[in-house]
Amino acid sequence: MKYFLEHNGKKYSDKDLIDAFYQLGIKRGDILCVHTELFNFGIPLLSRNEFLQTILDCFFEVIGKEGTLIMPTFTYSFCKNEVYDKINSKTKMGALNEYFRKQTGVKRTNDPIFSFAIKGAKEELFLKDTTSCFGENCVYEVLTKENGKYMTFGGQGHTLTHYAEEQFNVFYRYHKIFSGILIDENNISYNKTISYYVRKLDISSEPNLINIINIVNNTKNFKKNNFAG
């Protein structure tokens, strides 16, 4: 047992986190997509890398080698006219996600705007090329078809709503084409084009997070567990 976190004078161990995952119904063989906001949990008791590795170890302890772990590693590269380098483009999605994508055996999707880092038994299902960020063969489509699980770890924000918006062709968004240079894991550069279902700026369409949370909370598939902060 390893204590890795403290909040309000109470220390939390890796066993505590593993138990919390089990209480949520996470199990061996699961496909698990995780959005993270670690700063909400408390004060780390370990060095940066050991702290992050402890959390990753807890995920894999529960889902096992039969499971698959997915984390968003968004870069918005083509939106900023930047090259998307699958190995070197840093993610804007937090310290754990950036740490995870650099680990041995982790693979990254080709999406130059909304990429994901993936490791596990079914990783190849999620590595197909896509022509639209939230369209056919995107991570969220495969996650849905494979009955995967979606976790917000430390916060409530996520991009799953964007997938639903594109599937239902909402009136306040439209397809915008982005093009640029992608450098793959073999350091080979090539041109890529992708569609992103962006928001129409002349229409007020900010999502009502409270309503979304309430709708999700009322489904039989939603579970919540308080851990540390």
Question: Where are the regions that the model predicts?
Answer:
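N-terminal and secondary-structure boundary signal
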Residues: 1-229
